């Protein structure tokens, strides 16, 4: 992040806007990945509960 910031300042404002757009895209992908992981964990937990109930 620090290196990208230095590059943005060195290259100029137009390039900084470009870097910001890429940063937003990466951030959005990260959020989707996090949400999918949380959902996956929830489903895995439910499956484990069902298996435990079936065994018990």
UniProtKB/Swiss-Prot annotation:
Keyword Repressor applies: no
Main location group: secreted
Top-rank lineage group of the source organism: Eukaryota
Record-linked InterPro entries: Cecropin, Cecropin_insect
Keywords of this entry: Amidation, Antibiotic, Antimicrobial, Immunity, Innate immunity, Secreted
Modified residue annotations for Arginine amide: 55
Pfam families named in the record: Cecropin
GO cellular component: extracellular region; extracellular space
Subcellular location: Secreted
A GO BP entry: antibacterial humoral response
Similarity-based family: Belongs to the cecropin family.
PANTHER family: CECROPIN-A1-RELATED
Role according to the record: Cecropins have lytic and antibacterial activity against several Gram-positive and Gram-negative bacteria.
Name of the protein in its database record: Cecropin-A2
Lineage of source species: Eukaryota, Metazoa, Ecdysozoa, Arthropoda, Hexapoda
